[in-house]
Amino acid sequence: MKRLRRLLISLMITALMAAGMPMTAFAKPDWPSDTGIESEAGIVMDADSGAVLFGQNIHVQKAPASITKILTALVVIENSSLDDTVTFSHDAVYNVEDGSGNKNAIEEGDTLSVRDCLYLLLMRSSNQAANALAEHVGGSRDGFVKMMNEKTAELGCENSHFANPSGLNDDTQLTSVYDMALIASAAYKNDTLLTISKDKSYRLPATKNNPDGVTIQPEHKLLITTDTESPNYYPYAVAGKTGYTSVAGQTLVTYAIKDDRRQIAVTMKSTQATHYQDTIALLDFGFLRFENVNISENETAYTSGDQPVQIGDNSYQPSDLSMDTSAVITIPKDASFADAEKTVVTDLPEHAPLGAVALL
């Protein structure tokens, strides 16, 4: 019996960035490049294709502050049960940076489920929840940090090093807007994490200082603003995370959906006056100037005809090949699929599907 081979098509058009200046694989037309953001670093990435639609200093390392907690949540969800019980140790509660606060007045000995802690982590940005979850999942904070850095390597992050699960100041806690976009893209593909991040409120159970429980809400203004006249009203925002320290400045991750297109925007080293408006500018830029095109509907050279197809060192019959029907490329709206430069890659990554023979 002839063994069916599958040609994995995961073509994406990406803008290469150098010192914030976009360059493109297109000969025509020019890649759009005008967003006018004021943050020191910013990016908007298509979450389906992985294409960088605009970037400014995208590989420059900066302190992330509490957007770190997106990575923390992802590692926790992948390595624990939501119904596990987490006990807050003395170290989890009190071994934090002076002045960093204690959201919801958690005390040593308080117990919450992993689910409760994740809501406290992502909605209220609790450093105590970050520490307690790290101890629960990693056995220690250091053990969990090792898991965080292993996860970033798995996701292809090349300019990141995490030293704690909360994002509090540490000279070695550094990442880039590009790496954070990779992390966020993976995180919001996780159904549990996305559900928690989308919720507008959550009821925490009783703790020592809140014996009747307490209702918490997100802090990300683009997620909670309902006044259509507000400059922070953005109905396409679905999920995200805020961050701030004296070193990092304002940092922000936002996941938005419009017309079935999904985008990730990240800004770092911003100010209170600019980070939300920069994010809206980035997201609008991506939604208005780009579109996604299905690859399998436009690329037929490998799967049609009766002549053998050469891929790398091997030859295949077109009838033995198929394409990933969900794969898309992101292109400017004034470009076409024919404008894309195509490269066949046969050195496949470890996570490639069984039977895949190439990436296009």
Predicted features along the sequence, with ranges:
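Membrane-helix interfacial "entry" motifs
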Residues: 2-3, 112
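Sec-dependent N-terminal signal peptides of Gram-positive bacterial secreted proteins and lipoproteins
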Residues: 3-27
